[in-house]
Amino acid sequence: MSFIKDLYKSTNGNQTVFSLVELSNINPDYVGPKLNSAIKYLVKNGDLIRLSKGFYALNRTYSIQEFANKYRSPSYVSLYTVLFESGIVFQPYTSIYLLSKRSETKIINGVNLIYKNIKNDILLNSLGIISGNNISKATPERAICDTIYLLGGQYFDNTRNIDWELIKQINQDVYTNNKIIARWIQENTKLI
């Protein structure tokens, strides 16, 4: 089937999750009922995996973070997911934490996706957010600010590799000098 060939060509190995809109853009010959019929056929034959309504993967090794970003857009991976991955907190978290326009928890293929609501002007400010490999993810500095802003004062196990100038800039430009974040920065830079 030419649809699946076009799909493999378009990914270049980077994209692992596709929305219905992306699938229709890959091959413009497939629209409406023809697209739905092709997707149904590919899912039935095991060439595509249906992750959730309107979202598909080529195989089971898809990126759960990529899916989580696409499932609720705009969103970015942050909080304990980034803090654990970057070694700032040592307790492992199996859930994926993201910030988006609304709070909700979804379980998709056995993985908890926890979306936390944050104001639009903060959500849409790109300072401290890295986009690559089809994933938008906070830097450790942005994740610290996000966590303190949403959850209050926190203890972090390892802040040795934090860029303190970046964290101050994020507090100033994204959080408009939030007092709780500023106090945390002041208390923790004294320890250095």
Q: Across the structure, where does each feature detected by a protein language model lie?
A:
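Short beta-edge/loop segments at beta->alpha junctions of small alpha/beta modules
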Residues: 1-74
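Nucleic-acid-binding surface
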Residues: 58-192
